[in-house]
Design a protein with these regions (language model features):
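The feature marks the mature, well-folded catalytic cores of soluble enzymes
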Residues: 2-321
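Ferredoxin-type iron-sulfur electron-transfer modules in oxidoreductases and energy-metabolism complexes
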Residues: 299-325, 335-336, 340-382
C-alpha cells in the first residue's frame, strides 16, 4: 500500500513475529483466560457433535464414503477440474486459474477495479485467509469487509483468527463488547450507547453495523465449500445468513476455491452435506445451504467469477501418503478434540490453519523452509 494512501479497514494482526510452536505454546499456556475461553467453547461444540452424530446409524460408513470420494477426486483431479470448468463456463461463470496467492489476489483485485468498486463484502473463507486477500485488496485501495460475526470480531479487534470454524473462539463476550464499543464507530455504524455483553445485544449491533455495507456493496467475495463437477454448481454452507446476503445483493460475486473442493456429482455432495453440519456446528443441517449454478436473469449476482486456486495443493497431491490431508472439509472437529489446541490456542500454530490438520496441511502447502513450519510436528501428544 502506498505510504500516502489512508487505510480503509482495521490494521490486522500479523503472523510475522510469532515464534516457533514450542515457544508460542508457552505463551498460550500462560494465558489463563485464553484456556478458559477455549475449554468452554470446545466442550460445548464437542457435546453437540456427539449428539448429532449419534442420530445417524451409518455415521462411520458416511465418513468412509466421504474419504473414498475425496480419494477418487484426488486420483482424477485433472479430469474433474476440466469437467467443472466446462460446466461452469456453460452456465455463464467466468473461470480463472491461480497458481499461487499472488495470482489469486491479482485476479480478484483486477475484477474489482474493472467493476469500479472500492469495497467488497466477504463471506467467511479460510482460503482468502490463506492468501491474505484482504491486505492485497487494501494495498489496491479496496476495502474488504468481513460479514461473518466471528470474522467481524477478529477484523475490528485488529486480531488474527484462531479456529477454523469459530475464528474468534479465543474471545469472550466481555472482550467482544469492548471491541464493538471502541471500533465499530470508526468503520461504520457505532455500537449502541450503553450496550451490554448480552449476546443478543452484541448480535444486533453487528447486524446493524453490517447492514449498511450489504446494501451499498456492488461486489462480494466468497470461498466455497464444494464445487460439483458435473453441473458446475457452487456450494456454500453457513449459519448466520450473512453469506446469503453476499450471494444475493451484490451485482458481482467472486468465489476463490481450492482445487481440492471438487466433488463429482450431486449424489456425492449429499454425503458431505450430511457430515459437515453435524461434525462442525453440531447441527442436523446448516441453516443456510446455498447452491447456485451460473447466472439467472433478475436473481442474484449477474456477473460470477470462480478462481480455482492451487497454492501448493498440486504438491500435496503428488505425495502418495500426505495427499490424505486434502480430504479435509474444514469441519474443525479435530481442533475441538485436541488437548494441545485447547490449551495453547490457534495463534501458536502461526498460520490460518491451526490444530491437528493445520500442523499437517500448513507445512504441506507452504513447504518447510520456515522454522515455524518445521516445528509444527511438536504440536502433537503422539
Amino acid at each position: 500500500m502506498s505510504a500516502t494512501m489512508e487505510r480503509r479497514t482495521p490494521e490486522p494482526g500479523t503472523w510475522l513475529g510469532i515464534p516457533e510452536f514450542p515457544k508460542a505454546a508457552k505463551v498460550g499456556l500462560a494465558n489463563a483466560q485464553l484456556r478458559k475461553n477455549l475449554a468452554h467453547a470446545t466442550t460445548t461444540i464437542r457435546a453437540k457433535r456427539v449428539v448429532r452424530a449419534s442420530e445417524v446409524p451409518d455415521w462411520e460408513e458416511l465418513r468412509t464414503a466421504a474419504a473414498q470420494i475425496k480419494d477418487r477426486v484426488g486420483r482424477h483431479l485433472d479430469t474433474y477440474l476440466l469437467q467443472a470448468e466446462a460446466a461452469m463456463t456453460a452456465a455463464g461463470i467466468t473461470v480463472h486459474w491461480a497458481r499461487d496467492a499472488a495470482d489469486a489476489n491479482r485476479i480478484v483485485a483486477d475484477i474489482a477495479k474493472a467493476k469500479g468498486v472500492d469495497e467488497v463484502v466477504k463471506i467467511k473463507s479460510m482460503v482468502t485467509q490463506e492468501i491474505d486477500l484482504n491486505e492485497a485488496l487494501e494495498a489496491e485501495g479496496i476495502a474488504a469487509w468481513e460479514t461473518d460475526l466471528a470474522e467481524l470480531i477478529v477484523q475490528l479487534g485488529h486480531d488474527l483468527p484462531s479456529h477454523i470454524l469459530v475464528p474468534a473462539i479465543h474471545r469472550n463476550r466481555r472482550e467482544v463488547r469492548e471491541i464493538f464499543v471502541e471500533e465499530m464507530g470508526r468503520y461504520g455504524t457505532p455500537a449502541p450507547e450503553g450496550i451490554s455483553d448480552n449476546p443478543p445485544e452484541l448480535a444486533e449491533a453487528a447486524r446493524v453495523h453490517l447492514r449498511e455495507k450489504f446494501l451499498r456493496a456492488e461486489m462480494a467475495v466468497s470461498g466455497g465449500n464444494f464445487i460439483v463437477a458435473e453441473t458446475g454448481t457452487l456450494v456454500i454452507v453457513e449459519s448466520e445468513g450473512n453469506g446469503r446476503m453476499c450471494l444475493t445483493l451484490p451485482k458481482t460475486l467472486v468465489s476463490v476455491v481450492g482445487i481440492e473442493k471438487i466433488v463429482p456429482t450431486i449424489e456425492d455432495l449429499e454425503v458431505f452435506l450430511k457430515l459437515l453440519p453435524r461434525s462442525s456446528t453440531g447441527e442436523r443441517m446448516n441453516p443456510y445451504t446455498s447452491l447456485w449454478t451460473g447466472v439467472t436473469d433478475g436473481d442474484g449476482p449477474q456477473d460470477l467469477h470462480v478462481v480455482l486456486l492451487d497454492n501448493g495443493r498440486s504438491r500435496v497431491l503428488s505425495d502418495p501418503t500426505g495427499r490424505a490431508a486434502l480430504r479435509c472439509i474444514r469441519c474443525s472437529a479435530c481442533l475441538n478434540i485436541c488437548p494441545v489446541y485447547e490449551r495453547v490456542g490457534g495463534h501458536a500454530y502461526g498460520s490460518p490453519y491451526p490444530g491437528p490438520i493445520g500442523a499437517i496441511l500448513g507445512p504441506q502447502l507452504r513447504g518447510l523452509e520456515d522454522a515455524r513450519d518445521r516445528a509444527l510436528p511438536f504440536a502433537s501428544t503422539l
